[in-house]
């Protein structure tokens, strides 16, 4: 996991669209060259005094926070309005994160996209135009507040690393997040292939005061590149508690490697990119030490790993972990005679040495493992258990109660009811539950 902060000098000019017909009014009046003329020789005046017409007033521009403000709330962002005209240009100069924004319909207003940085100075310059062509430029300089308390955020995924098709984005927050909706709005996901997913809040959770997970509705498409940006600087995560950094990370999704095991059939199938590649005999947990049912993800792998328990202390080769409590797919050369026939392990999935080595070499963190047929159910948070929940239930974990549509251009929040029907096949998960492996 790593924390990444983005700093630097940014001066971002956000150009407005010129409205068609914005010069449709009459031409500006011109002032006369002189306000009088010399009298004729006869003393009669040939020219009367000409009165100067007033210059048309430009639109009234309002910038919030106002000029000279100190302690501005960064979570409110910047708002610009033009009364009696349209915005032509909004530029924001700051030494912090770049500021982008969007115009309203008709360019009557502009608002920054994300929260502002804490403890940062900003200068906003605005040009607006009236329908008669007159323009006005206004500038406001202000500084955001310095919070008494801040939160930090870490992402589990490593830069440029490859993960399995089940891997969620996992965020760890240093403080209890109560304003989860505001934080969720600040989380952006870009994907090289279209993905529908959702955020889920977990508190308390392993490793942190609060966790947030992004999981696709179905597994990630193999070969997807995922980029995450948390625009958290200036977001108020709890009363008086603000984020103070922007978090970014890019990682990849590798090939699809899915393991499905039945503790009653004593076999596991390995699917690679949707096709059955291996069907191996196994021995799972003996009665009293049953391997727990559930839809897990591989967490890590070790060769060997030291396993210690009642009556044993072993260095076990080719071990792939899928629960925090210590359940693995691993080489069990001592139980090859029982594999395929009887459950004799202390809870792990025993494999023959060659099979364990093959799976070890295939596995990366985030590869799905589904265990079925056991009398013992798995426990939420004993591993990366985000796939324990069906999609309809997982959606309820979103603070916004919305799904996310992600693609190359970023992500948007959408009403789940408007999404296309989920047509993904699910035989890989139902097989284990029905003990048909």
Task: Please state what every model-predicted region is.
Residues 165, 290-293, 302-305, 309-437:
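Exported/periplasmic cell-wall-interacting domains
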Residues 148, 209, 286-295, 341:
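Short, surface-exposed linear segments at secondary-structure transitions and domain or protein termini
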Residues 2-255, 405-406, 418, 430:
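Acidic, low-complexity Ser/Thr/Gly/Pro-rich repeat segments typical of extracellular/periplasmic
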Residues 247-286:
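A structural motif detector for short, solvent-exposed N-terminal "entry" segments of globular domains
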């Amino acid at each position: 996991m790593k924390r990444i902060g983005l700093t630097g000098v940014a001066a971002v000019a956000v150009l407005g669209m010129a409205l068609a017909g914005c010069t449709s009014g009459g031409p500006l009046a011109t002032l006369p060259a002189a306000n009088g003329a010399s009298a004729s020789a006869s003393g009669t005046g040939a020219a009367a005094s000409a009165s100067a017409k007033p210059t048309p007033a430009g639109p009234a521009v309002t910038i919030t926070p106002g000029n000279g403000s100190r302690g501005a709330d960064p979570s409110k962002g910047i708002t610009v309005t033009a009364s009696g005209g349209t915005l032509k240009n909004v530029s924001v100069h700051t030494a912090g994160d770049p500021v982008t924004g969007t115009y309203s319909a008709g360019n009557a207003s502009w608002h920054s996209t994300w929260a502002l940085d804490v403890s940062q100075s900003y200068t906003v310059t605005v040009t607006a135009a009236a329908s008669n062509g007159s323009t006005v430029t206004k500038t406001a300089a202000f500084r955001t507040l310095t919070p008494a308390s801040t939160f930090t955020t870490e992402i589990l995924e490593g830069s440029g690393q490859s993960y399995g098709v089940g891997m969620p984005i996992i965020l760890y927050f240093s403080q209890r997040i109560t304003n989860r909706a505001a934080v969720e709005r600040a989380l952006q996901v870009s994907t090289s292939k279209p993905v529908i997913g959702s955020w889920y809040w977990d508190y308390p959770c392993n490793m942190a005061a609060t966790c947030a997970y992004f999981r696709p509705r179905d597994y990630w498409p193999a070969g997807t590149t995922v980029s995450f940006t948390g625009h958290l600087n200036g977001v108020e995560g709890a009363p008086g508690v603000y984020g103070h950094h922007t978090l970014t990370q890019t990682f990849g999704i590798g090939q699809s490697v899915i393991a499905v095991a039945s503790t009653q059939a004593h076999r596991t199938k390995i699917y690679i990119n949707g096709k059955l590649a291996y069907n191996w005999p196994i021995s799972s947990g003996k009665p009293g030490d049953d391997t727990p049912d559930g839809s897990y993800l591989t967490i890590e792998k070790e060769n060997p790993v030291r396993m210690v328990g009642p009556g044993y202390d072993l260095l076990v080769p080719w071990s792939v972990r899928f629960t925090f409590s210590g359940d693995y797919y691993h080489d069990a050369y001592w139980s090859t005679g029982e594999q395929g026939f009887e459950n004799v392990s202390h809870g792990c999935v025993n494999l023959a040495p060659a099979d364990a080595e093959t799976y070890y070499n295939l596995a990366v963190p985030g590869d799905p493992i589904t265990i079925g047929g056991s009398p013992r159910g798995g426990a939420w948070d004993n591993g990366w258990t985000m796939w324990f929940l069906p999609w309809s239930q997982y959606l309820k974990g979103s603070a916004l109660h919305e799904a996310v549509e992600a693609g190359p251009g970023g992500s948007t929040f959408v009403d789940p009811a408007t999404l296309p029907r989920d047509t993904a096949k699910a035989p890989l998960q139902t097989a284990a539950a029905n003990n048909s492996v």
